[in-house]
A protein has these predicted regions:
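Accessory, non-ATPase domains that flank or precede helicase/AAA+ motor cores in DNA-metabolism machines
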Residues: 1-432, 444-460, 780-787, 791-809, ...
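Short beta-strand elements
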Residues: 175, 586, 741-759, 800-808
Length: 814
C-alpha cells in the first residue's frame, strides 16, 4: 500500500504529491487526511506532510517509507482536503500551506532534531576538528542519548543557530534523530477508578475510605478525590500498587468562557420582527430552503436590527439539524457577538479568534470537530471551522478588509465561505450598513439575492450629523478638538450620556521632526516615520516593531531640536482630559487591547457606565451597540480620504457611516460630529447624510471609467529583497516574462500592467519592496500563467535572495 503525501516547506516548484510506502505496522492508521512524518530530500530529513490519497501501486523508483502517523484519526474531511486544493490553486500557495491555515496552531507539529556523538571514530578525523567542533564533540561524547542543539550549544556558550552540529553530522562524528513534536500538548487530567476483583485485598482505614468514595462516584480526578477525602496522593498510589485502583489520563478541553462579555438583550425567547425585518427574513429563509448554495446580501442602515434577522434565521437552520458559522471582522466585535449567542444558544457556541491561547484554540477546534458545538463565531479563521452539514455562513460587516489575509495563503474568507456553503448547499449571507462596492454590484446584477432594511429598529432614528471645518478652528489654535466637539462632550457628560471619539492613528504623536534641519525621524529598517508613545517614552515603528527611547537630540544634525507633530490616540486622550474636566476616559487601540480579554474588559466597563468617553482607533467604530451613547465623533478623516489606493473613498465612507451609526441607538436621539479640513468633499457630505445609494452611484461610475473592480480583477505581484537594485531588476524581469507569455500561449489573456513601482512604503524590515499591479480577469488561464511565472522565478538562482508572491484581489494594492 502506498500513500501520496503533500509535504511542508517546499516552494511552488516542488509542490506536488510524493509517493511513500506504508509500513505494515502503519496500515489502517495511515489514512487520507492524517498527518505523517516522512523522510524528504537527499538528506532524508524528516518533514511533516498530509496524506492526500491512498493507492495500491506507484510509478516511482526507490520509494521511501512513512516514518510515523501523527494523528489517531483524519484531521480533515474530504471537503476540507478539496478546499485546500482550491485555495492553493486560487492563491498561488502550496497545498500544505493551505492545510496549515485550516488547523489551529495548537495542534501543529514541528520536527525537533537532536544529536548524539558517534563513538570509536578514527582519531585522525577527530584531530582535524577545530577547537569549537572538538568542544561540541567531546561534550556529546560525555552525554548519554540524544541532546537538543539549543541545549548543548547554549551550555557551551555558542549561538543556538550555529551550524557546528550539522558540520559534525556531515563528517560522520554525530548521529541525528528527528522527532515530530506537538506545539501544544493536550490538557490531560489524571483520573482514578476501581479495578475489578479487588474486594479481598487488605487495606488501611484511609485506603478503605478512598475505595468507598470510588464505589459511589465511579471515576474521579485524583485532585478531587484528595479534596473529598482529605488524604494525599500517596494513599492512591499505595492502592494502585495493590491493584485496587487504576489511574488513567482523560483529556479535558480548555473551554473559552467570555468572563467579561457585555450584557445581551437576547435570550432563548421568541424573536419579534418588524414588517421590514420579516420581509427580509422570509426571503432569506426561502434562499436557504432552496438548497442551491446561494449568496445573499442584507443591506441595512446602522441600528436596523440585522442581528434579530440573523438569530431567527439561525433558529430555522438549527431546527434542521444543520450548523452555522458567524464571522465578524474585528476581535473587538467578538465579545458583544458572543454574548448575544451565548445567552441564546449556551454551550452550543464555539469561538475562534486570536485572544484565545493556543491550547484554547486547539480545544475549541476539537469541540467543534466532535460535534459539541453547532455554531462557530469568530474572525477570519472561523471560516475553516471543522463543521459538517453547514446550513448558513454569516459574514457581518462584509465590507471590511480584514476578511482578506495579507499572509500566505492570501485567501479571502468571503470566497472560502461561498465555496463551503456551495459544497453543503447552504446559504452565504453577507451583511453590512455600507456593503463593499463589489458585493453591492453583484446584488444589483442579480448574482446575489438582495434584501434591505431602511429604518432603524424601534423608535431609534439616525443621528443628527454636523460637519466641522477644522480650517477655521486651526486659526484659533484649536488643532484637533473643535469648540463644538468640546461643548457637546461636556454637555453629554452632564446629561449622564456617553460619547465615542474615533481617531485613526495610534500613539501620542504621529511623527517627530527636527526644527533645526527639518529631518523627520524614520525607522532604520523601514522607510516610514516613527511614532512617539508617551506611555513608555519611546519612538516606535508600527511596521517592524523597532523602538528606541526618545531624546531631543536629532540623529541627523545632532542638535537638541526634535519636536512632536501630529496627534495619535494617546495625545487625544490627554487633550480630552483637559477639555472635559472630570470625565472618565477610556482609550481602546491595539496598544491598550493587546492582552488577553482586554477587549472584553474594555467593552464591559464601558457598557456598565464606568466611563464617559471611549476614544480609539477603528475598533471603536464598527458594530458596537451601546444604548447610552448619544454622541459620536471623528477627529479627522482627511489622511484616509486622500491616499493613493483606489478603495480609499469607499473605506472613508464606510468608516464615517459606521462611526455616525454608533450614536443614538437607544431611546435617546443621537448626534455625530465629523471634523475635517475639506467639508466640501462629496464623500464626507454623503456620509453625513448616510446616503449609501448616492455614494455607490458615484463610485461605480468612477470604477467603470478607470477600469477597477468590479469591472476587472487585480493581481499584485510583489517583490522583496535586501538589495534594492536586484529587487528592481527581478520585478522588471517578471514584467518581461509576462509580455513574452501574453504574446505567445497566453495571448487570449487581456491585461493592463502597471509598474514595476516601489511599494507605498518602499522599505520594511531592511528589505526593499516593488510591485507589479495587473488588471486582469481571474480566469483559470490567467492563474496558470502566474503560476508558471512564479515557478520560473524560483528556478532562477540569480534571484535566490529575492522573494516574490502573487496576491489576487488584495484589499490594499499599493
Amino acid at each position: 500500500m502506498y500513500a501520496q503525501v503533500a509535504v511542508e516547506n517546499v516552494n511552488c516548484t516542488f509542490d506536488k504529491d510524493y509517493d511513500y510506502s506504508i509500513p505494515q505496522q502503519l496500515e489502517g492508521k495511515a489514512l487520507v487526511g492524517c498527518r505523517v512524518a516522512v523522510p524528504f530530500g537527499v538528506g532524508n530529513r524528516k518533514r511533516i506532510g498530509i496524506i492526500t490519497r491512498l493507492t495500491d501501486s506507484t510509478q516511482g523508483k526507490r520509494i521511501k517509507s512513512i516514518s510515523a502517523v501523527l494523528d489517531e484519526a483524519p484531521l480533515l474531511s474530504y471537503e476540507m482536503m478539496s478546499l485546500a486544493r482550491w485555495i492553493s490553486e486560487q492563491t498561488f500557495c502550496t497545498y500544505y500551506e493551505a492545510v496549515k491555515a485550516m488547523l489551529p496552531a495548537g495542534i501543529n507539529h514541528k520536527i525537533i532534531r537532536s544529536f548524539c556523538a558517534v563513538p570509536g571514530v578514527d582519531e585522525s578525523i577527530v584531530a582535524s576538528l577545530d577547537s569549537d567542533e572538538k568542544q561540541v564533540y567531546d561534550y556529546l561524547l560525555s552525554r548519554s542519548g540524544y541532546v537538543k542543539p539549543e541545549n548543548f550549544l547554549k551550555t557551551l556558550g555558542f549561538d543556538v543557530s550555529s551550524d557546528i552540529p550539522e558540520r559534525l553530522l556531515k563528517a560522520g562524528l554525530l548521529a541525528a534523530n528527528d522527532d515530530a513534536v506537538r506545539n501544544i500538548g493536550d490538557n490531560n487530567i489524571r483520573m482514578v477508578r476501581l479495578c475489578e476483583g479487588s474486594d479481598d485485598v487488605s487495606m488501611t482505614k484511609k485506603q478503605s475510605e478512598v475505595v468507598n468514595v470510588l464505589k459511589d462516584v465511579g471515576s474521579v480526578s485524583v485532585k478531587e478525590l484528595c479534596y473529598f477525602t482529605g488524604y494525599t496522593p500517596s494513599v492512591i498510589s499505595a492502592l494502585e500498587k495493590k491493584g485496587v485502583v487504576e489511574c488513567f489520563e482523560r483529556e479535558e478541553l480548555r473551554s473559552f468562557v467570555s468572563r467579561y462579555a457585555v450584557q445581551s438583550a437576547y435570550d432563548s425567547g421568541e424573536i419579534h420582527l418588524t414588517d421590514e425585518q420579516q420581509k427580509a427574513y422570509d426571503g432569506l429563509l426561502e434562499d436557504y430552503k432552496s438548497g442551491t448554495g446561494k449568496t445573499a446580501l442584507l443591506y441595512g442602515v446602522t441600528g436596523s436590527g440585522k442581528t434579530s434577522v440573523y438569530l431567527k434565521l439561525i433558529d430555522a437552520v438549527l431546527a434542521d439539524n444543520k450548523t452555522v458559522i458567524v464571522m465578524v471582522p474585528e476581535i473587538s466585535l467578538t465579545p458583544q457577538t458572543l454574548s448575544v449567542f451565548h445567552s441564546r444558544y449556551n454551550d452550543g457556541v464555539a469561538v475562534f479568534h486570536s485572544a484565545l491561547s493556543a491550547g484554547e484554540r486547539a480545544d475549541e477546534w476539537k469541540r467543534v470537530k466532535n460535534g459539541d458545538a453547532k455554531i462557530v463565531i469568530g474572525t477570519r479563521s472561523a471560516v475553516f471551522a471543522p463543521l459538517e452539514n453547514i446550513g448558513l455562513i454569516i459574514i457581518d460587516e462584509e465590507q471590511e478588509h480584514t476578511y482578506k489575509s495579507e499572509q500566505t495563503p492570501r485567501y479571502n474568507a468571503k470566497s472560502v465561505a461561498r465555496y463551503r456553503a456551495a459544497w453543503h448547499k447552504g446559504l452565504t449571507l453577507l451583511a453590512a450598513a455600507t456593503p463593499s462596492v463589489d458585493s453591492f454590484a453583484a446584488a444589483k446584477s442579480g448574482k446575489y439575492s438582495f434584501y434591505e432594511l431602511k429604518n432603524r429598529y424601534g423608535k431609534a432614528v439616525l443621528p443628527q450629523v454636523v460637519t466641522v471645518d477644522m480650517r477655521n478652528e486651526q486659526q484659533t489654535e484649536n488643532r484637533e478638538l473643535s469648540h463644538e466637539l468640546i461643548e457637546e462632550l461636556n454637555k453629554n457628560r452632564t446629561d449622564g450620556k456617553q460619547s465615542i471619539v474615533l481617531i485613526n492613528r495610534r500613539g501620542y504623536n504621529t511623527f517627530v521632526s527636527c526644527t533645526a534641519c527639518g529631518e523627520v525621524v524614520t525607522c532604520p529598517n523601514c522607510s516610514i516615520s516613527m511614532t512617539y508613545h508617551a506611555a513608555n517614552g519611546r519612538l516606535m515603528c508600527h511596521y517592524c516593531g523597532y523602538s528606541v527611547r526618545f531624546t531631543q537630540k536629532c540623529p541627523s544634525c545632532h542638535k537638541p531640536a526634535l519636536r512632536y507633530a501630529g496627534f495619535g490616540t494617546q495625545r487625544i486622550e490627554d487633550e480630552l482630559e483637559k477639555a472635559v474636566p472630570g470625565a472618565r476616559i477610556m482609550r481602546m487601540d491595539t496598544d491598550t487591547a493587546s492582552s488577553r480579554f482586554a477587549h472584553e474588559e474594555c467593552l464591559n466597563a464601558f457598557a456598565k457606565g464606568d466611563y464617559d468617553i471611549l476614544v480609539g482607533t477603528q475598533m471603536v467604530a464598527k458594530g458596537l451597540n451601546f444604548e447610552n451613547v448619544t454622541l459620536a465623533a471623528v477627529d479627522s478623516v482627511d489622511q484616509q480620504l486622500y491616499n493613493d489606493d483606489f478603495r480609499s473613498l469607499e473605506r472613508t465612507f464606510s468608516l464615517l457611516t459606521q462611526v455616525v451609526g454608533r450614536s443614538g441607538r437607544g431611546e435617546h436621539p443621537g448626534k455625530a460630529i465629523i471634523q475635517t479640513l475639506t467639508p466640501e468633499n462629496e464623500i464626507i457630505r454623503l456620509a453625513a447624510k448616510q446616503d449609501y445609494d448616492a455614494f455607490y452611484d458615484t463610485e461605480i461610475r468612477m470604477r467603470r471609467l478607470m477600469i477597477y473592480p468590479p469591472f476587472c480583477d487585480i493581481c499584485v505581484v510583489g517583490f522583496s529583497g535586501a538589495d534594492e537594485v536586484k529587487t528592481r531588476v527581478a520585478s522588471q524581469r517578471t514584467l518581461d516574462k509576462i509580455k513574452e507569455l501574453t504574446a505567445g500561449k497566453y495571448k487570449n489573456e487581456k491585461l493592463i500592467v502597471l509598474g514595476p513601482l516601489p511599494a507605498r512604503v518602499p522599505r520594511v524590515n531592511k528589505k526593499y519592496r516593488y510591485r507589479l499591479i495587473i488588471k486582469c480577469r481571474n480566469t483559470k488561464g490567467f492563474r496558470s500563467m502566474i503560476s508558471e511565472i512564479l515557478k520560473d522565478f524560483y528556478g532562477d538562482s540569480k534571484f535566490s535572495d529575492v522573494s516574490v508572491y502573487a496576491d489576487m484581489n488584495p484589499e490594499i494594492t499599493v
